[in-house]
Structures are given as structure tokens and as C-alpha cells.
Amino acid sequence: MATSADSPSSPLGAEDLLSDSSEPPGLNQVSSEVTSQLYASLRLSRQAEATARAQLYLPSTSPPHEGLDGFAQELSRSLSVGLEKNLKKKDGSKHIFEMESVRGQLQTMLQTSRDTAYRDPLIPGAGSERREEDSFDSDSTATLLNTRPLQDLSPSSSAQALEELFPRYTSLRPGPPLNPPDFQGLRDALDSEHTRRKHCERHIQSLQTRVLELQQQLAVAVAADRKKDTMIEQLDKTLARVVEGWNRHEAERTEVLRGLQEEHQAAELTRSKQQETVTRLEQSLSEAMEALNREQESARLQQRERETLEEERQALTLRLEAEQQRCCVLQEERDAARAGQLSEHRELETLRAALEEERQTWAQQEHQLKEHYQALQEESQAQLEREKEKSQREAQAAWETQHQLALVQSEVRRLEGELDTARRERDALQLEMSLVQARYESQRIQLESELAVQLEQRVTERLAQAQESSLRQAASLREHHRKQLQDLSGQHQQELASQLAQFKVEMAEREERQQQVAEDYELRLAREQARVCELQSGNQQLEEQRVELVERLQAMLQAHWDEANQLLSTTLPPPNPPAPPAGPSSPGPQEPEKEERRVWTMPPMAVALKPVLQQSREARDELPGAPPVLCSSSSDLSLLLGPSFQSQHSFQPLEPKPDLTSSTAGAFSALGAFHPDHRAERPFPEEDPGPDGEGLLKQGLPPAQLEGLKNFLHQLLETVPQNNENPSVDLLPPKSGPLTVPSWEEAPQVPRIPPPVHKTKVPLAMASSLFRVPEPPSSHSQGSGPSSGSPERGGDGLTFPRQLMEVSQLLRLYQARGWGALPAEDLLLYLKRLEHSGTDGRGDNVPRRNTDSRLGEIPRKEIPSQAVPRRLATAPKTEKPPARKKSGHPAPSSMRSRGGVWR
């Protein structure tokens, strides 16, 4: 019964209908929900029954079960009120009583419903149909024949009724006919009978359908009544289980309370016994502590007495030491008087007799001292039990010995008075006295050691006894505490076991919740990961598009830049330009401020040059006599640039420059032959322009490329401020000889992603210093020939390739070590250092490789500086360039400008 009530398959349990108010609110809520569902089902069944009965009965008649419905409503109200009261009560007996009353009401309601069902049948065939278990075979012929639904609606089947219905047939008699038959009338009567019969059949069919509907409604009502009865029976059974569970719960509760009371009484008895034993143990411990305190006090008194005796002994030893010191002093006096003893030797011999007498007296005194020492020893042995009396007697003995010592000292003084007559005798007496004192001291030390040993033995014995008693008491206490701890540990283990079981249940629930949460988070994580993968793929596609666009832009800019270089290399200004006026040999400090010119310079290209131009000084001296070779006229460039560029004053035509081996275009073709990986901005590593840099101009540019080149040059020239002074400005340094590339400096082609294009505004003075290097002093500086009048001759033609070689080595070092692209700021600083430190090697006639060790140090120093962006502002005005010694040309610093060049 209890198992069925507690099983999850049962519709109602004991915990669901009756729950004490002390239970958690979850159980109350569950029980109230179950009860509400039960009553809702009852109400629905009653409503279905009421609707079925309303359809069965006519509107004039009233259903006979209105009293039963009212009784059921009152019962439901009483049940709801009782359940509400049950939520507030705490007594189980009241719940049981109310459950019994509810069961009685349910049984009466069930009995009344059965009685009314069997007592008031709706139709005569209802009882037989109930006995036949509500068979639904209403469509069968036997059922239709057995039922009599037309007794109340149709007339009875008696003879009169038949005669009324069929007057002609009833008039026919088996006897002879009264009148002759009328066939026409008979035919008409037959037709009328046919129509009447059809009408009757239709009426019978409609009545039968009505009967079938009523039978179906009756079956539904009966089924609803049976369902209601079964539900009431189930409720009665459930309430019986609840009552039985409550009775069993009350019995178990009383048994548990009785057991708990018995355990409480037993625990009180054990606690009282333990309290008594604890009080007894505390009393015994207090007594033991008092005895131990007394023993400690006696030991402390004995220690104090020993300390006093030790102090007296130390005082006596100090006095003896003083006497010994005096004896030493007397011995010294004796030694001093030995010189006079020789003369008195005879007198000493006469006094020997007196000395013998004195010896006898001293022997007697020694005997007396020995006897007195023996007496003291006996007294000390007799006084071992009482240490205080012994100490007093020992003090008395010490006082007597001190008195005797005083007597001896008086005798010594007397003998000192007679020292002149008996020095030797006195020495002997002193020796004997020292011996007696040593013996006395040794005996006294021995006595004190024996007394100390005996005292320590007694103290140790008493302490051992006290320790044994305390150990026994501690062992008994420990055993008692161990038993108590065992009992407490058993109870604690039981409580821990119950708590552990509860904790395991809670942990299992928590783990389930956490597992659900973890699954939810895993689902979210999987969704987010999928989303991240999609975003990463999209980002990768965008990055690829960006890289492709950057590469295209860099390729376009590189193509424009190559075309501009080729155009500038193939064009030359008109011949015979006016020579600039010669300045003083050493320009003053005010020259940069007076003569400022706007220089349109090429941006410095980070190209890789190898050590070239291995030529002698004589070959360079012979070359100025050669006629200059002009590549083209400036009209070609003016036609290319258009009137908008010609109107700008900052654009200056190029001066004719003599070339050693070929035209200036050849020099630029040599520039195009540099290593492609070491240019300033190289978009595609696979491109190699080859040795010819002006191939595009030789073949002819299409109009679209010419228009793009015009736009690019227009943007370059718009950044340069206009200046009308100094219309003749050198654009590029001379290139001497073909630029050969040795095979021992070839660097491996490492394809890498090019860096993005950066625009850095470099001061024009710094940019001009890259191409204008001070010329070293030469022997031809004073001449008036072309060698002294053109800046393309002399040291400039030698220093600039050397700087390019050093820059090429630096770039190759960056590439070989994998440090990436060289920043423009670091390259400018390095070139500036070369400009200031390059005066050492200007006197050399043959260009050589730079063996400076700073080439390996500068990359190491400049690599950390890449993390910090440095902006190079305009050069300070206080910085002065090195003075030129040539008289033909002013210093290049005079052509510096305060503007900037975009690179």
C-alpha cells in the first residue's frame, strides 16, 4: 500500500494531498496542483453528464440529479476548505480525521448516484441495457424489434386502432360479400393505402433515428456516470492510502520520539557520570598540584640554604687567599732577610730547643683541630635529615674555625715580633699551618660534595615519585578522554555519513545542472567558433584584396617613376647656359640666408651599387677636353610637360653635363641596372628592368602613359615652392664610366611582400646634401679652365659614387641579415654622417670600397630606432656646412632651401 501510494505512476500520493505546513513550499504546491486537477476533472465529468441529461429530458421536465450536483459542489467546497486548513495545521491526527470524513462523503455520494441510476430509469429498456453492460448494438434488427419506443407517441395496436387505421380491411369478413366489389374504388383505396404506408414508414424511420440518438446520449451519460464512479473509487482508495500512510507516519513518529527520549535520558545519565568523574579528576589534579607546589617550595628553600653556605664558603676561601698573600709577602721579606740569617745562624741553633717546644705545642693544636674536625664530621652526618640545623651547625663550626684562625693569626703576630730571633722556626710553622689548612679545605670540600650528592638523591627520589603519580593520573585521564573521543567520533562519523549522502545528492543535482549549462556553453562556443571562422575567412579575403590593390598601386607608381626617370635621363637643357658667378674662396656665414634657391631634386633612390669606376687620375684629367654629348633638347621636355609646367618658376632646365663614356642616358641606364631588391619601393620582386632604363622612351610612349606621367610630374612640382633666383641648378651628379657589378657581391633573390608606400617629407637641404657633396681640394682648383668652372669635375665625380657604394653595401647588409626594408630616416642619417666624415678619403685618386667598420655597426644601432617614429624637421639654421676651397663655385649649402621634397 505504501509503495503504491509513493510510486510515481499513482495519480495521487500521501504527500500530494496532505502536507504539513512545516514541509517545504514545493510539496504544498505540488499537492495543491494535483488536488485542483482532480476536482477539475470531476467538474468536467459532471458538466458532461448534465449536458447529456439536458438533451435527454424535455424542456418541461427537470433532471432528477440536481440535488446530487449541489451535494457534489458542497463536497468540493468542503474539500477545498479542508485542504486550505491542512496547509495551516501541524497536527497529523486532524488530517487523518478530515480524510476519514472526506471518504465517508465520497462513499455516500457514490451510493446515492448508484441508487438514483437504478431507481429512476429513463426508459424501460435502460435497465436491461445496464445489465447488458451498455451494449451499443442499437443498429441491429433484434434491438430495434425488442425496443418499444412508440407506446407513448403512437396509438396502441388494439382492434379498434386497426379498424380506425384500416376501415376497409376491417370491414372485410370471411363471410360472403354484402355488396358486389367495386374495382375502381378498391384501386383508389389501394393507392391511398400505399401512400399512407409510405408516410408511416417515413414516420417510423424518423422515430427510430430519434430513438437511436436518445440511446447514444444515454450511453454517453451512463459512461460518464461510470467514469465518475471509478474516479470517486480511485479517490477513496487514494485517501485510504493517505490515511494509512499518515497513521504509519504517526506511529513511526511516536516510536522515534520515544527512542529519542530514551537516548536523551541515557545521554543525560552518561553526561552526569562524566561530570562527576571530571570533578573527581579535577580535585585529584588540584591535590597533586598542591603537593608539587609544596615540593617545589621545599626544593627552593634547600637551594637558598645551599646558596648561603656557598657564599660563606667563598668568603672563607677569600680570607684564606688573603692570608696566603700575606704569607707570600712574608716569604719575600724572608728572602730579603736571608743575607742577615747567616750571621744569626748560631743564634738559631740555640733556639732550636725552643722551636721543638713550639712544635710540640703546634702538634697538640693540630691534634685538637683534628678532633674538632671529626666532631664536625659526626655532627654533619647526624644532621643530614634536617638540612637547616646542619647548616647552622656548619656555620658554628665555621665560626669556631674562624675564631681559631684569629687565634692563629694572633700567634703569628706574636711570632712576627719574635721574627728576628726565630725566622726559620716561623717558616716551618707557616708551612705546617698551610698543610693543615689544605687538609681542612679538602675535607670540607669532600663533606660538601657528599652532602650535595645525598640532597640531590633525595630530591630526585621525591621528584620521581611525583612524576610517577602525575603520569598515572595523566594516563587515566588520557584513557577517559580517549573513550569520550571515540564516542564523539562515532556520532560525528554518523552525522558526516548522513551529511555526505545529502551532499552527494546535491552534488549530483548540481553536476546535472552544470552539465546542462556546459552543454549550452559548448553549443554557444561552437556557434561563435563557426562565426569566427566565417569572419576570419572574410577577413582573409579582404586582406588578399587589399594586398592585391596595394601591389597594383605600387606597380603603377613604380612604372610612373621609371618613366619619369627615363624621360629626365633622355632630356637635356639648351646649350651654353650662363655660368654662375664665382663666389669667394671661403663663403661667409650669411651666404645661405642671402642666396636661397629652390632646388627640384630627384628623390633619393635606395639602389644597390657595387664598387665601380676603377679608373686613374690621368684618365679623368683628359676627359674634360672632350666635347659634351647632348641627348636631346629641352624643347622635347617642354612639349611633353605642356604649358602648365613651363609656367612654373620652380622648374629649371637641365644643364649640359659631360659624360666619360656615353651620354647621361647611359648613366641612368646604369642606375636602372641596379639590384631591383634594393630600390626604395619595389612592388614586385619578380620584375627586373634590365640594363636599359630608357627603352620605353626609345620605343615611344602611348598618349595614356604620357598623360599619367604629366599628372605625376605635376603633383611632384606642386610641392616645391617657387623661387626665381638662380635659374641654373644642377639636377643630378655625374656618372663616370659604366657601372659594373662584380659577381662576389651578388645577393640572393628573396621574394618578400613589399612594404607599403610611405610619404616622408625630407628637408630640401638634407635632400640636396645627398647629391651635393663637398669637393676635396685639388691642384686644379686655381685654374680657369673647365675643370675649375664646372661642378661636375673634380672631387664631386669621385665622392658621389663612393657614397653610393657605401649605401649599396648597407642595403645589402640589411637584406642579408633579414632586417627588412631600410627606413628613410636611418638612410638620411647615415648619408649625413658620410657627408661629414667623407673628407678623409677625398684625396684618393682611385675609388675604393668602403672598409669602414661602422657599416656593420649602424644597422645594429638603428634597428631599435625603427620602433620609435622620428620626424625630421627642417635642418637647423645654426648648422654650417664645411667651407669650400674652390673659387669657381659657391658652397652647395647656399642652394639649400627651407622647403621640402616629397619622397
Curated annotation (Swiss-Prot):
Residues 1-34, 110-140, 471-493, 568-597, 669-704, 772-799, 837-903 are annotated as: Disordered. The modification Phosphoserine is found at residues 80, 790. InterPro entries: Centrobin. GO terms for biological process: centriole replication; centrosome separation; mitotic cytokinetic process; regulation of cilium assembly. GO terms for cellular component: centriole; centrosome; ciliary basal body; cytosol. Residues 572-590 have a biased composition (Pro residues). Required for centriole duplication. Inhibition of centriole duplication leading to defects in cytokinesis. Widely expressed (at protein level). Highly expressed in testis. Also expressed in spleen, thymus, prostate, small intestine, colon and peripheral blood leukocytes. This is Centrobin. Residues 365-903 are annotated as: Required for centrosome localization.
